[in-house]
Structure formats: structure tokens, C-alpha cells
Amino acid sequence: KLPLLCKYGFHGKIFTTKSTSKLLRISLSNSYQIMKEDSQRQKVKPLYEEEDVERVFEYLEPCNIGEGIQVNPNIKITYFDNGHIIGAGMILVQISYPGEQDINLFFTGDYKPYNVFKKVQSVPTWVYELPMNVIVESTYGDTETKEVQYNFENDVKNILEQRKSLFIPVLAQGRAQEILFILKQMQNDGRISKEIPIYLDGNLSHQYTHKYRSGELEIEEEKLEFLPENFHWVDKDTRPFVMASKGQKIILTTSGMLDHGPARLYLPSVISNENWAIFLTSYCSEETLGRKLIDNEFKDKAIEIMGQEVYVKAQIYSTSQFSSHAKADELLELLFRFKNLKLVLVNHGEKETMKKFALRVENANFAKRVEVLGEYTVKLAHYGFVKIMGAKLYTMIKNKQEQPKKEKKKKLRMICRRKNSFSR
């Protein structure tokens, strides 16, 4: 959306965290390439051009964590640290007009209280003491941390002890680097052999991994060298040799849901071989190949991949321990820190999950008002946030208002038809 905004004349400041500003070129360039290829395939005009991507960086304003930025005389924003991924932040918006009550809005964005690569800085006490309105995510608002099974390391150890090779689909940013970090720890602890080669495929994952190791981001110095021993980069030229090589191996490749990226090129050989195990470490949405494998939809049934029909013979494993979103108890713990919580707007989750989490917040009784964002139209008024009406009610009123106009047009058409018939 940023290049599209710039294309249509936006020339204001684009505020972001310092780490995001250093990762953004990778993300936007990749998005542009995907969009360009899609538009060529569908024979439609691209939404924006490469120069629009470049324009974004002209307006970029990297911000320090915890340092207030005066956007204009009445609005101030402050970024606070967030463990979701490197570069993530939570934002405090403070709105102040002479003679009016100050309004404070805290937006969590995608939130996680910790990150394997850094110590997440605490939000200062003064923020929690403000009269506050919070927009909070709820991706896992119906799940507790105690429900998460931390099975990855034990399962990897057991798979390799069975002399099987391991195929791990990963997200290019965050997940690929975290799993490489854990595999290195397992090597150092003697839980997996350093003799087993570890490969990383996927151009985007390579770019992010190089950036993570560069020292430019807020990654702790002792964690910069997270690549395991016997590690190898894989590209389109070396890929055939990796697959043809004998002996045990571990392959990490994009995409995490198995629907795109180099993963598709490996799958026909991997999935049909009982000497392989596939370990899904990312959230897989409905209808993706990853989800279908987790749900065992291809039991005794052929699956078509890259034009080949194969049967699933590889062992399928999955885990939710790498999720980059807080669970319900962690979200409640964050909200509980606010001493004067006026309004909580629950956002970013499945419809039922948002409702369940909103009910938990309401029952916890530490917020004066709790709403599910999207169920109602909410606007900013002089004295705070006001719920106008439900989306259904809005539609009903709109339809009712439009009905007389439709009736009027209908009557007019009938009169015209009558006049025409008389003239004949």
C-alpha cells in the first residue's frame, strides 16, 4: 500500500522503527516483483511501478524506540518495543487540543512479549498510568500459553535418530532465522550431529538472513552468528545437487504454508519418500497444502504437485511453538498493566476468537468498555472514542434511506413509459 499511496500523490512523512526502515527495501522489492509477475500473468496493468517503491524511501522517517515524535502541534506518537518480529513496535498516539480533554490511544499491532534475538524493552510506567484506549490484537485470543506444545527440538532429535532427512518449510523473515538459531544450539548441545548438512533455500530468506547477521538491527551481538555448522546456501543452480546428494540432510525453504517458493520444487521427491519427515512450523491457513497435510487429508489418496501425482509417505509433523503472536493470557497480562483503561477495542482475529477474547477482557473487569472492532462504527469525538452504530444497523438505515429514491425512480420510469406509449 505504501508505493500505491506515493503513486497517488502522498508526500508526507512515513514513520517507522529503525529496524523496519532497514528491512523495508527487502519486503517492498519482493512485493513489487510478485505483483508485477501476477499482473503479467493476468494481463492487467500493475498497481504501481518500481519508481513508486523508491519514492517510499524519500519520505521514510526512522524513529527511536521510546522517543516521542511531534507529528503536528496536536498529535504526538511514540514507538515502544515489541517481540513480534525484529522491527515490530507498539504505538502510543497522544492527541491534545487546548480546552479539550487529552485522548490517548495505544495500538499493540501484532504483539509478542519476547523475541529469541533480543531482549524486548519494557513499556515505561508512565504510559500505563495514562487514561488509555487500547486497540489489541487477538490472533490467539482463545489459546493459553500452557496449551502450546514445545515439541520441535525433541521431535527433530527423534527424526534424525531414525536416520530420516528433515524438510522444514519456513517464513522468510523471522522463522527461518529462529530455526537456524535453534539448530545451532542443538548442535552445540550434542543433540544433533554436526555431520548432517543444513541447507537454506529461498532468495528472500537469504536476504533477511544476511540482514539479521549484519549488525544493523537491534539483535544482541552474541546472537548475530546464529548459522549452524555445516550450513549451506542453496539457489536454483545448486538445488538439483542438494536433492541428488546421498545421506541425511536438513532443508529449510520457503514458503511456510507450502503453496509457493522453492518448497514446491522439492515436494514431489520429499513427500513421496518414507525416509523424509516434513516439519511444518508456521501457521497454515485453510485450503493451503500445509493445512491439508496437518489435517491428514491425503491419507491413501494421491496428491498433485508440480504436475506430478504422488502419495504421502513422508512423516508429517507440526508445532505452534514458533508463533509470533501472544496468547490470551499474555494479552490479558499486557492489558492488566494499564491503571486507567477506558476502552479496549479487540482487533485482528477470527470473528469468534475476537468475541471470546472480548468477553474475557470484559469479565476481568479492568476496562470500563470493551468492543470488538468491526462490529460497530467507532469514531473519535472531542471527549474520546464513540460507538456510533453496528455494521448491520448501518446497512439497514442506508437501505431504508435509499428506498424512497428507488421508488421515486421507479415511478418516474413508469410515467415515462406511459408517455411513450401515448405518443405511439
Q: Model features per residue range: what roles?
A:
Residues 136-150, 168, 221-227, 312-332:
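Glycine-rich phosphate-binding "P-loop"
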Residues 27-28, 33, 299-302, 306, ...:
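Amphipathic alpha-helical heptad-repeat segments
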Residues 117-135, 284-311:
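Short, compositionally biased "basic patch" segments
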Residues 58-66, 228-237, 372:
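Short acidic-hydrophobic, aromatic-tinged amphipathic segments that line or gate anion-handling sites
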Residues 15, 61-63, 78, 106, ...:
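Hydrophobic/aromatic beta-strand patches that form the interior of the parallel beta-sheet core
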Residues 153-292, 301-304, 338, 347, ...:
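Hard-cation-handling environments
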Residues 62-121, 241-246, 250, 261-265, ...:
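Core dinuclear metal-dependent hydrolase active-site scaffold
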Residues 1-197:
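His/Asp/Glu-rich metal-coordinating catalytic cores
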